Amino acid sequence: HSAPGGGPEDQEACKPYKIPPFNPLSENGFFPESIGKFKGLRAKIDDPAFIDALDYEKVLLKKMKVEHEYPHCWRCKNPVIFRITYQWFFKVEDLREKMLQENKKVGWVPDTAKHAYESWIKNLKDNSISRQRYWGTPLPIWKCGDCGAVKVIGSRKELKAEAGKIPENLHLPWIDAVKITCGKCKNPMSRVPDVIDVWVDAGTASWNCLDNDPQKMKEWFPADFISEAKEQTRLWFSMLSIVSYLYLGKNSFKNVYVYGMLYDIGGQKMSKSLGNVISPYELIDKYGVDVMRSYMCQTNAGEDINFSWEECKSKVRGLTVLWNTHKLLINLSRETNIQPFSLKEAKVKKYFAVEEKYMLSRLHSVIRQVTELMGQHRMDEVIAPLEELFLELSRAYIQMVREKSLLGEEEEKEACLYTFAAVLLETMKMYNIIAPFICEAMYQNLKEEFALGEESISHHRWPKADAKKINPKVEQGMKLALEIIQAGLHAREKAKLGLRWPVKEALIVSKSSDVKEVVSQFQNIISTQLNAKEIVFAAEAKEMQYLVKPDYSKIGPAYGNLSPQIIARLTMDS
């Protein structure tokens, strides 16, 4: 059984056998008079009548329900049917190889999107471009009712030359009053009644917005960058390519960033009918625009995600740290009577300690990293290093220099505040692309406090990385030192020993020569942060005692009656 007029797969299967497609159903799914006693019945709804007829004729072998995929209306959820109609098409099947070759020049993020698009191109069919609607761009094709000649009109100017007089508004219904003379039989030609698929409009946007102006096209076409959801692989991305190849012989974009879909908390597609839509305004009203932007920016390219209020709260905490950091800079400046943005690096750099060298190295490493990521259009990877940078500024650098910035020598204070201000401002310039509202509010506060020159954070140029300030060894050493400090603070917490209480010594045990070198280099920082009078390094800690604590919940079920003996032995050995 095959129904070439009832679906694309059946139609393709019948083509080699020259079986013509047909489908007598009306637009509303009713059978016509030509079908005899079944006239007036409706497809799908009246299926039982056909089954009863087969049963009456004693030709029904079996009646049963079979589960299979079937198209349904996205709005009312009722089944829909395929129905063959006459349409206008773009002939694109012979463009496939050309499109595949041109696509190799396009930068896709992620790579999976590129592979999906290539697969789509390989299976590309001639594309239907006409629709039977009222709203839409009228199909600019005139047909002669006598000889059947067809003429495609390419512009308003051409139509006016053919028709003599045309209406100001070229949409329906006014356009249908325009007649032109057939070049073959001299009889009137009328416009075909269809409108153009809206995706054709979208596909021509890349040059329509330039008014087809040669100079603008040379300057702005093709587009450097476009971005849309992955479902646009077969829609906008496809039509952008098709119409561009047909008209200009080349692609209309150079780089594509593809993002995934946002589902509800339980992983379902959001739908008004299901009542599970999370409005962006709900999120904005609760936490602000920047939280929504930073939350969305962290999503891996091309991956679907389930919405999470907890992750939004995490972004709130991060942005709060950033906000508090700029307030701290203002307070430090007032307490020390130092204007950090008036300081020149040439004056203060000779007083840079390892903390300043580390923080400035981290800044320029991140500038270089983020600039490269932006150039490669890997937008989802930009936010993490920027957030790490301002969190390190707040939780690492400021903690390390807090005492020095208030009680140190004047030159030390200036070095601290210069570094603090420089790192904060450069970070804000970059993070502004993600969280522009908080960055602008911070900048206006800094501008008022320190009389900064630019009117807005957005008026600043993108930072440039200074390779001379990047010191990987210092960064790696400080990273390890911070891990040691974190481990020491954890040990204090386990021992329920507050940080205010000094300890005689902090013992760092490791067989790593790298750790030994870091402990030696960053000894003062480690001892200060751990409030330890002495830092001791040892490859082995002979005076340490290891205690083995049996996990009764695991031993009991696994060993049954042997559990008491095993527990006793473990306790004895430790």
Stretches found by the model and what they are:
Residues 295-298:
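Structured mid-domain segments that build the active-site/substrate or prosthetic-cofactor binding neighborhood
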Residues 8-13, 239-248, 386:
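Alpha-helical support elements that line or immediately flank enzyme active sites
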Residues 220-232:
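A short glycine/serine-rich beta->alpha loop
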